[in-house]
Curated annotation (Swiss-Prot):
Protein name from the UniProt record: Single-stranded DNA-binding protein 1
Organism of origin: Staphylococcus aureus (strain COL)
Motif window: Important for interaction with partner proteins: 162-167
Region (Disordered): 107-167
Gene3D superfamilies referenced in this protein's UniProt entry, alphabetically: Nucleic acid-binding proteins
Comp. bias (Low complexity): 109-118, 132-147
Length: 167
């Protein structure tokens, strides 16, 4: 059987953190995940998915995620039940996370969720937008590989049998 869940969403509130009597760290949080389609009014609805994570990942979630943080989770769906204070049976379905990925810088939430304009400007520099005075050895050496292409001077169709193709 297959039980796998992969979600990307934003935390609806700060994670709740506790330690079990046996010393295991536990963090619970709710992810708001947008649906891929719109409703009759043209708005996207969201699902609110309960998640739980244990041990070191729980410590990291507690230390680095907060309300509004963008996170990706990978885990499995699990159902459990318990009896509440009124004596009623309560059923809970949640994602038990094997992995939680932090999908934005920690300081992104300090600006109300808005990125500063220059926050990511340096990321494009390695892809041809070299600034003056910057020594980028990747750009200098990447163009020398063109002569290694065995088909660079081919003038017609390539003669290859179907038996030589890997598919």
């Amino acid at each position: 059987m297959l039980n796998r869940v992969v979600l990307v969403g934003r935390l609806t509130k700060d994670p709740e953190y506790r330690t079990t009597p046996s010393g295991v760290s536990v963090a619970t949080f709710t992810l708001a995940v947008n649906r891929t389609f719109t409703n009759a009014q043209g708005e996207r609805e969201a699902d609110f998915i309960n998640c739980v994570v244990f041990r070191r990942q729980a410590d990291n979630v507690n230390n680095y995620l907060s309300k509004g943080s963008l996170a990706g989770v990978d885990g499995r769906l699990q159902s459990r039940n318990y009896e509440n204070q009124e004596g009623r049976r309560v059923f809970v379905t949640e994602v038990v996370c094997d992995s939680v990925q932090f999908l934005e810088p920690k300081n992104a939430q300090q600006n109300g969720g808005q990125r500063q304009q220059n926050e990511f400007q340096d990321y494009g520099q390695g892809f041809g937008g070299q600034q003056s005075g910057q020594n980028n050895s990747y750009n200098n050496s990447s163009n020398t590989k063109q002569s290694d292409n065995p088909f660079a001077n081919a003038n017609g169709p390539i003669d290859i049998s179907d038996d030589d193709l890997p598919f």
